[in-house]
Amino acid sequence: YSDNEDLTMRKILVISIILSTVVLAQNDGLVKTYYPSGALETEGNYTNGVRDGLWTFWYEGEVYQDYGEDGEPNTQDEGEGNSEWDSTETVLLDLDGDTFFDPPKKQMEGSYLLGNREGLWTTWYLNSMRKEESNYTSGKLNGTIIRWYENGNKSEDGVYETGKQNGIWIWYYETGIKKEQTRFVDGQQDGLWLQWFTDGAKKSERKFTNGERDSLWTSWYENGNKKFQATYANGKLNGNWTSWYENGIIKEKTGSYS
């Protein structure tokens, strides 16, 4: 390089460092973002340009414009006229005084550490019932995770270890009855995989070893009759297999139709 080119490169480098410092400085401290409607969307802290500390995410909710002559927010509930306000509803007034918002409801909340999710994270349904609780370490799922249906009943629970499923996992019907249960080792199914019908009767019993089908696999109809049965080894069929009609009559056996 010539002296002039070298000087130009140094200037560019200095300017880049200054601009980077300015950008980082602008992204430090408490930051709030808003939906196009003006409702609060996110609220959290930046440190050195990355998310750090508690962050909260909000549902937008409904937005109302004051079209009424009475000066009250028109929530436009079914059966109401444009100039009527349902006084049983709570709304928030914006700074300009011409827009009203539903009180903010949390959608998700959790903490960041150096830009990565850390610790307990919680999400909610719009009705404020819990939807999920999960745990993170350095941005990866680590620890228990629980999910719920909107009615409050549990839908799923299990454990992650450094981003991979481990241990016993259970899924439930919305009624609370157990739907499915299996075991994971380092992210792969290993052990029995059980399923049930909505009335609690067994639907299937299967086994995995290191993520591959293994041993006897059996499934049933809701009336209790067998539906299918086969034996596996190393992920492949091993020996005879049989399928049945719901009335108990054999449908197919060892690859030959009856």
Language-model segments: which ranges?
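Intrinsically disordered, low-complexity segments enriched in proline/serine/threonine
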Residues: 9, 75, 105-106
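Short acidic, low-complexity intrinsically disordered linear motifs used
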Residues: 68, 77-85
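Short, Lys/Arg-enriched N-terminal segments with co-localized hydrophobic residues
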Residues: 1-8
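Sec-dependent N-terminal signal peptides
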Residues: 11-22
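Selective for proline/serine-rich intrinsically disordered segments
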Residues: 5, 71, 101-102
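Internal, charge-rich low-complexity segments
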Residues: 59-74
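Glycine/tyrosine- and acidic-biased, solvent-exposed loop/turn segments at the edges of beta-strands
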Residues: 21-63, 81-84, 90-258
